[in-house]
Amino acid sequence: MLSVILKSSVRGLGKAGEIAKVRPGYARYLLADGKAVRATKDNVALLEQKLALIEEENSKKLAEAEGVAKSLGAERLIIVRQSSDDGKLFGSVTVRDVSKLLCDLGYDIQPRCVSFSEVIKRTGEYEINVELHADLVATLRLHVVRNESEAERVRLGIAKSEDQAAAAAEVEQAEDVAAAEQQDSSPVDDHADDADGVADGEGRDEGAGDASDEEEMPST
């Protein structure tokens, strides 16, 4: 096992600035990819001096990954594959296929960053995972269809769903505004004050009546 200092976060291994022990083959990959340096005495001393800078850089990369995740969430991921009438593919969709699709859309996503929860051997809708950062994995929807006409129907269906969701949100917002305006313009309830006034009047009348009765009573 070799000790390396991680220059960036690596999922399942550690965060930027941490020292990790890995097999020689994996160490060579990390070193070549610029994700780690050898944990020599000099490098460890240098790490202690630059740890704050490394953490700042990691936070910056995480923020960038969050932006990519938001952008990816708005994409319509569709792969066209030949299949039998019952939807069974002639082959399967691989992580390389998804990586190429994302690259064609302008995202630099390597195959090793893509994973599936199941093997994709039929047409349909699937969840796929894309690792954008050691602390961030985006879950996306992938549609696998037989031909371009089906792909277009999927695009229209997604667009329709998005329009319906937007319309529902606008209606809900309008209802909230109307309810707030109605509440602000509601008259103050004076019934309680009126009732108190009537009760006070009745009390005064009863008191006056009792006094009259006492005056009319003959003396004995």
UniProtKB/Swiss-Prot annotation:
Segments carrying the region annotation (Disordered) are 167-220
GO CC terms in record: ribonucleoprotein complex; ribosome
Keyword annotations of the record? Ribonucleoprotein, Ribosomal protein, RNA-binding, rRNA-binding
Record GO biological process? translation
| InterPro entries reported in the protein's UniProt record | Ribosomal_bL9 (IPR000244), Ribosomal_bL9/RNase_H1_N (IPR009027), Ribosomal_bL9_bac/chp (IPR020594), Ribosomal_bL9_C (IPR020069), Ribosomal_bL9_C_sf (IPR036791), Ribosomal_bL9_N (IPR020070), Ribosomal_bL9_N_sf (IPR036935)
- Taxonomically, the superkingdom here is Bacteria
Q: Which GO terms describe its molecular function?
A: rRNA binding; structural constituent of ribosome
Checking Pfam families in the record gives: Ribosomal_L9_C, Ribosomal_L9_N
Tell me which NCBIfam families the record gives: L9
Biological function:
Binds to the 23S rRNA.
What's the name of the protein?
Answer: Large ribosomal subunit protein bL9
Gene name, per UniProt, is rplI
